[in-house]
Amino acid sequence: MLNGHVVNYGKHRTRRSFSRIKEVLKLPNLTDVQTESYKWFLDKGIKEVFDDIMPISDFSGKLSLEYVGYKLQKPKYTVDEARDHDATYAAPMHVTLKLTNQETGEIKTQDVFFGDLPLMTESGSFIVNGAERVIVSQLVRSPGVYYTGDYDKNGRQIFGTTVIPNRGAWLEYETDAKNVSYVRVDRTRKLPLTVLIRAMGIGSDSEIIEMFGQSDTLQFTLDKDVHKNPADSRVAEALKDIYERLRPGEPKTTDSSRSLLYARFFDPRRYDLAPVGRYKINKKLSLKNRLYGQTLAETLADPDTGEIIVKKDTVVTHEIMDKLAPYLDRDDFKMVTYQPSKEGVLPDPITVQEIKVYSKVDPEREVKLMSNGHIDADVKHLTPADVLASINYFFALQDKIGTTDDIDHLGNRRIRRVGELLQNQFRIGLARMERVVRERMSIQDPSTVTPQQLINIRPIVASIKEFFGSSQLSQFMDQHNPLGELTHKRRMSALGPGGLTRDRAGYEVRDVHYTHYGRLCPIETPEGPNIGLINSLASYAIINKYGFIETPYRRVSWDTHKVTDKIDYLTADEEDNYIIAGANTPLNDDGSFKEDIILARQKEDNVEVTPDKIDYMDVIPKQVVSVASACIPFLENDDSNRALMGANQQRQAAPLINPHSSLVGTGMEYRAAHDSGAALIAKAAGTVEYVDADEIRIRREDGTLDKYTLEKYRRSNNSKSYNQTPNVKLGDHVDESDVIANGPTMDHGELALGQNPLIAFMTWNMYNYEDAIMLSERLVKDDVYTSISIEDYESEARDTKLGPEEITRELPNIGEDALKDLDADGIVRVGAEVHDGDILVGKVTPKGVTELSAEERLLHAIFGEKAREVRDTSLRVPHGGGGIVQDVKVYTREAGDELSPGVNTMVRVYIAQKRKIQVGDKMSGRHGNKGTVAAVMPEEDMPYLPDGTPVDICLNPMGVPSRMNIGQLLELHLGAAARQLGIHVATPVFDGANENDVWDTVRQAGMDKDGKTVIYDGRTGEPFHNRVSVGVMHYLKLTHMVDDKIHARSIGPYSLVTQQPLGGKAQFGGQRFGEMEVWALEAYGAAYTLQEILTYKSDDVVGRVKAYEAIVKGERIPKPGVPESFRVLVKELQSLGLDIRVLDMDHNEIELRDMDEDSSEHLNIDTLSRMAEEQEKKKLAEETGKSENKEDSNETADKPVAPADESDGKVSK
């Protein structure tokens, strides 16, 4: 009897699962993070923005423009067409506006075009300029009021408060060493806190003391706040003090001061808390939260009946709070109204709720707790009640009443998703447009003006374009494989506009916080400068309407103390109130806890409690980690640093031509592939009527026919082959949302990132030293690790000043053999095999016309245009770009294709390369066990098993102990057993096969009980001394392939100023011979070698041409001249005003001649025309550079480039 139980993943794969916990909750759809948010934007977000900004009235109030509604029309291109035409997948947006003339009552309604709105594809990405992009969600501080506590050098606790809006000025309170409280308004210099209280209209000291109660801090602050100008009242003076700070040096009046303070904090148009800010402030300041755990200093009675609810001197517990809560929600319970002075910022009465409690510092003293009353959720600005209640909370902290906030707590950080980011951008565009509308209203004739004439959509279009094109959060989608796509869509970044910057982010922000549990993955984050700033959403987490991450828990019944199947989603601050048991806690069949003492979590502590104290229980162990981490079997046996690498490396797996899903999986593979958007999913149930490589047709039960088109060998964003293959047969019955076609790296509907080779952990002739990997030639011969890379190359024929460029087969000075694969138009045929330097698209460009001689003029007159000189500017295969021409696309203006201005024809050629695994490629397992291929050995030389099977891969056993990723060994043994038994297994993270399960399965497979075996040397046939661990592990080939990195320079471009060779593969650059390398040659005394490296091969412009000439003629190479960088140095020093001259041995001045035209003519360097040519090419390249190139090449190729001389410049200084 085998261990575990059988689970079906889709219709085509069965696995034996070792999980022991029943699944009470299905995984949510993994791309909902994106799709739900965009849907909200279309349904509600756009309307919210219009409602905020409209109606727009002119300055006299005659005209008023109102929003009625909007509709999206049919997109111009489908998703595939947008990709092909380098266009944006977007729908035209039409807004219905109503213009009312208030004087005549005339109403004009009109539909106005508001530009194209990019649409989200079904899988959660956008197509912008032909490239697929993802908008990454942003993790930011939530608006609200925050209290911090710190200790000064004398050990006294000092507190600070910050009121953070979504949009608007900050308000900060702080205490100093002398116990005086201060306020900062909008980051200006500080003022005594009582100045702000007086500005609210609470003028006299006695009123302030009555409102806030007597305390040392308040008294010290009042002493500091003296009445300077008796001519002004205290309120007017306070308003002017604040004005003075905000507008220093300007003349101040009471009215202007009042309106400025109003505009900063109380004007709904200028100050916005957003719904989340209002929710957080109401929650923080409400008495419900503040009374808990306090001792009441007054008796509380029912306002209607006078019946006592709670007596004086009672400590408020959970039970008492349950009794009190309904009263605290009433508008007539303990409410106090203050009437501010008429001079205050707002003259309206201020209503707050007040209850007295005893101080925690001095239990005799009464402290008044004040809430901000009951303010509606739709009040987005601050109110005087908010300000006074926040000050009251600040003073109460001195009496140890209230709590300080941790800004890294996920209750205080929220997610801005696509919808909100887009809405903010839309709001910016609309606000810019509003100004234009107002101006036009006052200019145009009110009787004839229409909405269309008032609107200028440019700012809106520009704002949206800018967001999708260049925002830090709009990213080129990672398309190495479906797991990479999915992870990218679920990514949470703390960077970006309004977020943190890499340099300013400290250790605390990056660290794992206890609130990450079930919300953000503690494992998956990049290595390097972004560590901890970019996170991945946990697998079961969802995001609520306020943008806080919620995670599911099973509710424990309060009366029976049994675990129910009722699921509650809790935010981080809700979770702080409960004690939660882990998902592995043993339960009886009826849901009661088996044990008397249970290990549980409470805030950041692990506690041991009795079952009656437990409020909730985890749903499933894998709710803690992200999708990529949940795909690592035996994650619980890996060190977290290596698990992080494993999670990241799975995203870099190159799609293989015949992938196999892992023998040892985790059960997450099916859902990850299904939701990634790479698989083809059935829209409705039915029967397969037709299937081939390009199309699947399914007849629904109601008789309608669905047609599904498969993607064939499309180039993905990362130059990988994106190919779909059918997963169904003729006559199969299909249910809705079944996988009917596998995408790249998929097998039977499951994620299949690599292969399952036979792996031995043994050293072999030092070939696998230091993480090197030794492979069997079988993996090359049988195309086990073969992947396809597809690169596209473009050539454009444009209009130049001298006439149009032409795409043609007639190229000057090119032999017929070079044209053998070109068709009649000069374009390479599909299927041709091309090598470096071959012509892909023949193109000629008119040359500059020089002064013609008499004979040439005669020829010109006889033969017409033909004698005009053209030069060959054909598109050729770049270094390392050879392969098979897979597709050619031609776009012309005549055919109606949209091309950039000045371009008549564009040809795009796709070249596919079949890349077998080879020395230098990077490979990895799922446990962060990465290495590079060091040797590919003949099959017959590989170590073999007793039955003669040669192993496929030899890994070094030394890579395991120090790295502590033992998961790979357990996977190895279980994989071997699974292959022997002919099964696939699933071992979910934290709830999978334990050591006993692994050894039981190994025994059932008839293997030795230690999982090791005798291994024979393939070269001698002798057995090795020790038994070796051999088994099956899922091993991946990563995208870091040696073909993309290998590079050698022959003759190439030089930097314009220093005349030294450029660097990097992208620029066909040289290898830098740096200062330390120079020391090495000096140490050897290799003077001539050093001299040629520093002159001919680098920046001696004249010398390198002469050297080339001498080599060609077979003469002695002349002495080198002065390096160009020396001239540059002299010029730099002269530009600083220093008189620098160069003298020879006899102190005679040497004339440092610049490279003028005479010398270049003498040297036969056509420098100027070449430079002009290069610069023109560069300019064209920049103009046509697609957004994806911007994203992809992070080389610093922006230096000006001088042409390649005929001489060789291998090395730069």
From Swiss-Prot:
Q: Where is the signal peptide?
A: none
Top EC class per UniProt?
transferase
Cellular component, GO annotation? DNA-directed RNA polymerase complex
Region named Disordered? 1153-1213
Q: What are the UniProt keywords, alphabetically?
A: DNA-directed RNA polymerase, Nucleotidyltransferase, Transcription, Transferase
Q: Name one GO biological process term.
A: DNA-templated transcription
GO MF terms held by the record? DNA binding; DNA-directed RNA polymerase activity; ribonucleoside binding
What the entry lists under InterPro entries is as follows: DNA-dir_RNA_pol_bsu_ext_1_sf, DNA-dir_RNA_pol_bsu_external_1, DNA-dir_RNA_pol_su2, DNA-dir_RNAP_su2_dom, DNA-dir_RNAP_su2_hyb_sf, RNA_pol_bsu_bac, RNA_pol_bsu_CS, RNA_pol_bsu_protrusion
Which EC number(s) does UniProt give? 2.7.7.6
The record, for SUPFAM superfamilies, names: beta and beta-prime subunits of DNA dependent RNA-polymerase
* Reactions that this protein is recorded to catalyse: RNA(n) + a ribonucleoside 5'-triphosphate = RNA(n+1) + diphosphate
List all Basic and acidic residues biased stretches: 1171-1198
What protein family is recorded?
Answer: Belongs to the RNA polymerase beta chain family.
The record's function comment reads: DNA-dependent RNA polymerase catalyzes the transcription of DNA into RNA using the four ribonucleoside triphosphates as substrates.
Describe its assembly. Answer: The RNAP catalytic core consists of 2 alpha, 1 beta, 1 beta' and 1 omega subunit. When a sigma factor is associated with the core the holoenzyme is formed, which can initiate transcription.
Q: What is this protein called?
A: DNA-directed RNA polymerase subunit beta
Q: Which gene encodes it?
A: rpoB
